Each structure stands twice: as structure tokens, then as C-alpha cells.
């Protein structure tokens, strides 16, 4: 049990650090303070690999986004912090549907994965970010929903392409269950 706790803390720390670094240095602006964020593909990998402890995906996004906002903007948008965490959490919660640690990532697994990420992003960017930003920044609803929609779509595409590729590569690097036979 203690080993799992250490593994969880280390994975969360490494994941949050990668989240910040990728977010700050690989950033493609598209609308307002919204940009294509490639760190979500890496967050997906951590969320799925440590799916049984999906809290890693949550804290990777949560901590990473807090530090990134603080470093980059000097102000923290708590709705977007929560959205990053929720995205990792939801993807991790459904991780058993697309368990890449066994060396398989079938078309059906890819479909489940993308359905899970769509659900996570719908909650994060369809509900949490517009309402949270309205409370925190009192911006116009039309702007908030436009910004959230653009971010949600950009993140969906990023995760669908980058996340699926990372998971497929990871799965191909694992030994498939039952592929080794006794001689």
C-alpha cells in the first residue's frame, strides 16, 4: 500500500511538471486567452496508465494549471483549473475500458477513450468554465460560452489525435496479455 502512495505522489509530481512545461513552451494561441494545449495529450497518458488511481489525472491537471496560470498570467482562473482536473479525472475513471497497460488498444478501446474524453470535456468546458468564469470574472455569457466552446473543441481534437497516438504507442510498447507461452 505504501508503495502505491509513493508511486501516486511521484506520478502526480512528474505529471504536473510536464503539464506546466508543455503548456508554457508549446502553446498555440487561438482565441482570447485560449490556445491549443498539447499537455492534455500527456495528461491523458498519465490518467490512463494510472487509471485505477484516476486522482493522478485530476491532480496533474489541477496542480499543473494552477502553477501555469500563476507563472504565465499572475492570476489563477479556478474554473479552468478545475476543468483541467476534471478532464484527467473522467478519462482516468473510464480507464478500464481502454486499458493500454495490457498491450492492447483496439478500435473499440479508441472509441471508448474518445467518448470518455468527450464526456470529461463537456463537463469541464460546457459547464464548469463558463459558470466559474462568470462567478470569478463577471464576463458576458456569450464570450464565456464562445471561449469555452473553442477550448473544448481544441482540446477534443488535441486529445483525439495526440492522446490516441500516445496511448497507441504506449500500448504497442507493452507485452500483450497471453502473448508469451511456456516452452
UniProtKB/Swiss-Prot annotation:
Bilayer-crossing regions: 11-31, 44-64, 74-94, 111-131, 149-169
Keyword Chloroplast: no
Compartments it resides in: Cell membrane
Pfam families, per database record: ECF-ribofla_trS (PF07155)
Main localisation: membrane
Keyword Cytoplasm: no
A GO term from the CC aspect: plasma membrane
Protein name: UPF0397 protein stu0306/stu0307
Superkingdom per UniProt: Bacteria
Mode of membrane association: Multi-pass membrane protein
Sequence similarity: Belongs to the UPF0397 family.
UniProt keyword annotations, A-Z: Cell membrane, Membrane, Transmembrane, Transmembrane helix
HAMAP family to which the protein is assigned, alphabetical: UPF0397
Amino acid at each position: 500500500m505504501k508503495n502505491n502512495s509513493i508511486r501516486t505522489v511521484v506520478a502526480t509530481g512528474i505529471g504536473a511538471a510536464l503539464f506546466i512545461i508543455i503548456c508554457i513552451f508549446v502553446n498555440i494561441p487561438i482565441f482570447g486567452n485560449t490556445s491549443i494545449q498539447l499537455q492534455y495529450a500527456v495528461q491523458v497518458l498519465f490518467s490512463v496508465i494510472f487509471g485505477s488511481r484516476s486522482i493522478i489525472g485530476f491532480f496533474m491537471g489541477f496542480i499543473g494549471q494552477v502553477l501555469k496560470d500563476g507563472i504565465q498570467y499572475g492570476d489563477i482562473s479556478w474554473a479552468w483549473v478545475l476543468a483541467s482536473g476534471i478532464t484527467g479525472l473522467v478519462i482516468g475513471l473510464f480507464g478500464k475500458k481502454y486499458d493500454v497497460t495490457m498491450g492492447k488498444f483496439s478500435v473499440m478501446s479508441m472509441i471508448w477513450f474518445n467518448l470518455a474524453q468527450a464526456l470529461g470535456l463537456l463537463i469541464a468546458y460546457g459547464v464548469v468554465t463558463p459558470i466559474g468564469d462568470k462567478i470569478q470574472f463577471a464576463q458576458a455569457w456569450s464570450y464565456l460560452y464562445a471561449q469555452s466552446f473553442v477550448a473544448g473543441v481544441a482540446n477534443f481534437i488535441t486529445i483525439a489525435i495526440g492522446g490516441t497516438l500516445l496511448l497507441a504507442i504506449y500500448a504497442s510498447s507493452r507485452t500483450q496479455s497471453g502473448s508469451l507461452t511456456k516452452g
